[in-house]
Amino acid sequence: MSMSDPIADMLTRIRNAQMVEKVSVAMPSSKVKVAIAQVLKDEGYIDDFAVKAEGAKSELNIALKYYAGRPVIERLERVSKPGLRVYRGRNDIPQVMNGLGVAIVSTPKGVMTDRKARATGVGGEVICYVA
């Protein structure tokens, strides 16, 4: 059976792993998932990630980050879904928690944060909110 929303699956795996205080979480890899993991790492929400290739299939391993015994990621919410895509122009990209959180946006120039998209002057599909 094929997965209808691999990005939502990735976010759910991260949320579930953090609820049981796992050190890392593994999932099937894709270019978009790796790009999202890179943004999460750059913003300090995860420790690290690695892609392990086994023949035709590859696996993405994400090392989760905790501070004082609590997960660094408090909120991880999917915005644009397969049934309802959410696109925003460069002037309409939302701020998460008045700039304390991050919106991850897929733009023609790659996957980036809301701040970088505004600075670059591009809009795109709002993938998720992270806080």
Curated annotation (Swiss-Prot):
Keywords: Ribonucleoprotein, Ribosomal protein, RNA-binding, rRNA-binding. One of its GO terms (cellular component) is ribosome. Pfam families: Ribosomal_S8. InterPro entries: Ribosomal_uS8 (IPR000630), Ribosomal_uS8_CS (IPR047863), Ribosomal_uS8_sf (IPR035987). The keyword Protein biosynthesis does not apply. GO terms for biological process: translation. GO terms for molecular function: rRNA binding; structural constituent of ribosome. NCBIfam families: PRK00136.1. HAMAP family: Ribosomal_uS8_B. One of the primary rRNA binding proteins, it binds directly to 16S rRNA central domain where it helps coordinate assembly of the platform of the 30S subunit. Part of the 30S ribosomal subunit. Contacts proteins S5 and S12. Belongs to the universal ribosomal protein uS8 family. This is Small ribosomal subunit protein uS8. It comes from Burkholderia cenocepacia (strain HI2424).
